Amino acid sequence: RVCDITYDSIRRCVLKTGHGVKTTHRMPTLREALEVCKDRIVVNVDQGYEYYDLVLAVTEELGVTDQILIKGKRSTDAVAAKFAEHPRNMMYMPIIDILKPQGRALFAEYQEKGIAPLAYEVCWNKYTPEVKECMDKVVAGGSKLWVNSLWASLCGGLDDDAAFGGDPAEVYGKLV
């Protein structure tokens, strides 16, 4: 269980390359990672919404709040309430599991309220007309489309492993 892992044992972990080769780099803290990224890139703090206040405190201290993206499956009202607690906020991107009832309902809520976030992460396990319709609405509404290509189950099999093991243009070409 993750909760049984100590901070010291995590700090002893060595990072690996995408192909599993060990590097000389140790597991950084969030603060260390953000210090390296400052004024360079946008950072997706995955699974970070549950820790929004803690992450925001670190980003504000480091002056990187405008570079941080937090994703989640929260209602528009919940996000608005959380953002109202702070004078400055990180970017928020809704995750839409468009083939699931909760995902369809969340997307409909954003559409009905006329809220156009910077981007939506649209997830699907099989490409269907409903997926295409959602993507078309995202783009037509002025938002960007984010596809999580790390796992096949989030992008209908159009993932990085499929691209690496086959023709990248064939896989990624379907996403752009």
Locations of regions flagged by a protein language model:
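Hydrophobic faces of well-ordered beta-strands that scaffold small-molecule active sites
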Residues: 43-45, 68-72, 88-97, 118-122, ...
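Metal-dependent phosphodiesterase/phospholipase catalytic core, i.e.
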Residues: 1-90, 94
